[in-house]
Amino acid sequence: TIMGPDETASVFVGSGQTLVLGAAAHKLVVQADPQDSSRVALGVNIAGQVTPLDTQAIGDGLIGGLMRFQDQDLADARNRLGQLAAGLASAVNQQQSYGLDLQGQPGTPLFSFTGPQALPASGNARDASGNPVASVTLAITDASALKASDYRLAPDPANAGQYVITRLADGQVFQPVADGQSVDGFSITIGPNAPAAGESFTLKPVAAAASNLQLVLNNPRGLAAANPVVAVANPANTGTATISALDISAAPADPYQAMTLAFTDDAGSYELRDAGSNLLASGSFSAGQPISYNGIALSLAGLPKTGDRITVEPTTHPAASNGNALRFDNLASRPLVDGQTVADAYANAMSDLGVRVQGAAASADNSATVASRATAELSAETGVNLDEEAARLIQYQQGYQAAAKMLQTAQTMFDAIVNLGR
């Protein structure tokens, strides 16, 4: 706000846009953000033309605080919680798919959540129905690598058919990015009509994940607590090898397939065959290294001998197995959220929220002080001091009385002059 020499005030906002100049006033309007349709933006309507405001330049105060809350605090909190929800739900659903439920069926997902979204900018070309011509779809490829951030995608001016992706949280630029490529745990697929020069999309991998997280498995009998297979050593084995662990690292392609692991020499060479004696895999056992096939990792302690056998067969009594349930418990110590455990990620999110709340409280106090000072200055310029006005009234009264006395004296003198002429 600038006071003019004629006591008029001119009001400017943002990076210099005019709200009030002399007798002219322009309206502050709220509109959809041109880059992100899920947010609102401010603009100044001058003669019917809306000029966007740079919210970073608005400063403090009620409007600045609300815009920062939307653009920074709320967006960051939503992304942090979405990152946490997507990482946890994806890991639980994946582990659920590795096991068998009480009916002996592979586990179905426990949770559902809204996946990544790509929002077109308002300036992108649209068809006659108002739908964007270009389209972009996203898919999660590694939930544990997802970042708590939105992204901006635009055509790469230096590489035709490729794109520039900017991570908005820290400004990290990925260039060039090809159709189908993965960035930070999600992949980008360009539709049949690619974005043209000047068009852009706001990518939101995790923003909606927490708000739409739902439990979709309501029957406890559907919890896949059992391992799909069990490993049994042949009682006639002569070596010292024993089964130390049977881990499931992926959903088995055929969880009901029986396999036999046979060692062909004392050096640890082995063959893995199915029930029909067809060779599935072969290799050499190394102490401390699991033997892996079809999503199954078998770890042994000790040394096998020639002719030793271990059979891996389907679980016949799922109700008596808790192997996969134990791995659900192990999820608590795994880095499921961008290198952090779920507990650490939640603690960091709450810590960041606390810092922001304290910063907002301090900013509010500072703004209140500035507002109080501005109010005092305004009162000093435009307010009424009763003592001063009373003194002025007395002065005016005395001046009036003196003027009246002068008029009375002049009237007397005039009358005297008239009488002399008679």
Language-model features: where?
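S/T-rich, low-complexity, solvent-exposed segments of bacterial secretion/appendage proteins
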Residues: T1-R422
